[in-house]
Amino acid sequence: MPKRLDTRLESEGGEFLVLGHLLLNRIAAYKTYTNMPGYDLIATKPEANTSARIQVKSRWRTGATGFPISNFDCDFVVAAFLNRGAKDGSKQAKAPEFFVIPVDVVKSLPRDARWSKVDLRQVSDLNQYKENWQLVSDFLANIHAQSKPAQRIARGRVG
């Protein structure tokens, strides 16, 4: 059986790349402690006291289209295709690609029984999620909008 490529450094790098993209898009975000179940990053909107849990699924190989996932305790899954080439040298490295996908979309995809692997080619109009960091911003804003009436009711004021 061929030895599995150790991609732990690239995996950590993928999380930091996603973190950087969030910050560059003016979304406050933080890396969690190692091995938090279900998510790797927390995006926040401090002034609204809201947060979004983000699981980063990085793939090292150029041309990868899927990843294993079994824990859906997050709000978004960011597929970070690092595109570092191929183990056998048959593929060239190219720029990483990122897909910001709501967890319910990923959860609805068929998964293979052995590895719980999803294939993003199954997502209709996958390009709508490519580099779509605005989805996280909108999520953080909408949580706040939805919680306002509840906060007013709790204080005895409606409207």
Predicted regions and their residues:
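Mixed-charge (Asp/Glu-Lys/Arg
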Residues: 1-37, 42-159
